[in-house]
Amino acid sequence: MRDEIATAVFFVTRLVKKHEKLSTQQIETFALKLMTILFEKYRGHWHPDCPSKGQAFRCIRINNNENKDPVLERACAESNVNFFHLGLPKEMTIWVDPYEVCCRYGEKKHPFTIASFKGRWENWELAQHVSCAVNRATGDCSSGTSSDEESCSREAQIIPKVNNPKSVYQVENFKQSLQPWFCLPRRKHLADGRGFLPGAACHPVPKSSKWCRPASRRVDRYHWVNAQLFSGQTAPGEPGEEALSSLKQK
């Protein structure tokens, strides 16, 4: 019960904070009062073996027929806060049930999950889901689906796989064309011929250079990343730390 109530209070206070009508101290006082009231109300009405039992009693609801939820109104009264300064949506329902906290923004829209406690959660994961739920409740994200767990998450960036067995990059499906690499602009740290790029064919290396790689077509975008760079033994003409850090950002 503690985690579910804390999540509901965190969700409400995030909505209040986004409205920017109350000070930080007022929000903290309101959150403390709301949590205390919810613990008092839900004690004796919490059934982990049957989460749906007492669901209507535990829900926090605001709509056109009842524009002030009794629990929120009491928390405002005990913390000396104007209810309408909370800036909550005109139609919103929050269900605080064992193992799950859900919300519905609008009476005719589908509910979505704020947090589910059926598995283990890290603090940052919970905060991310609550933040996304706040965005949905304030209209920043689409609210037509029943779950938004993936709608506000970032896609993982994958480094393509390369064919060099010495390369540190071993991710699948390298299909990117090599043509753009032959049109890179000249960089200051490569002007003296100390560094090498596949695109160096556009800029001749000075004759004084004692060693350089042939400008043949490469099948490995990261062929310059090899064991020598990480063992500290860099061959003449191989890119140094400055060139390495610059190229890895591309």
Swiss-Prot record:
Checking InterPro entries in the record gives: Anti_prolifrtn, BTG, BTG-like_sf
What did gene disruption experiments reveal? BTG4-null mice are viable, have body sizes similar to those of their wild type littermates, are healthy up to 1 year of age, and do not spontaneously develop tumors. Females are sterile and their embryos are arrested at the one- or two-cells stage.
SUPFAM superfamilies in the record, alphabetically? BTG domain-like (SSF160696)
Task: Report where it is expressed, by tissue.
Answer: Expressed in oocytes. Expressed in testis and in olfactory epithelium.
Question: The organism sits in which domain of life?
Answer: Eukaryota
Annotated Gene Ontology MF terms? Answer: mRNA 3'-UTR binding
What would changing residue 51 to A do, according to UniProt? No effect on interaction with CNOT7
Q: Name one GO biological process term.
A: maternal-to-zygotic transition of gene expression
Q: Which GO terms describe its cellular component?
A: cytosol
Which SMART domains does this entry report, sorted A to Z?
btg1
Result after altering residue 59 to A: Loss of interaction with CNOT7
Family from the record: Belongs to the BTG family.
Listed under subunit, the entry gives: Interacts with CNOT7 and EIF4E. Interacts with CNOT8.
Q: Explain the purpose of this protein.
A: Adapter protein that bridges CNOT7, a catalytic subunit of the CCR4-NOT complex, to EIF4E, and facilitates maternal mRNAs decay during the maturation of oocytes and in the fertilized egg. It is therefore required for the maternal-zygotic transition (MZT), zygotic cleavage and initiation of embryonic development.
Write the protein's name: Protein BTG4
Q: What is the lineage of its organism?
A: Eukaryota, Metazoa, Chordata, Craniata, Vertebrata
Which gene name does the record give?
Answer: Btg4
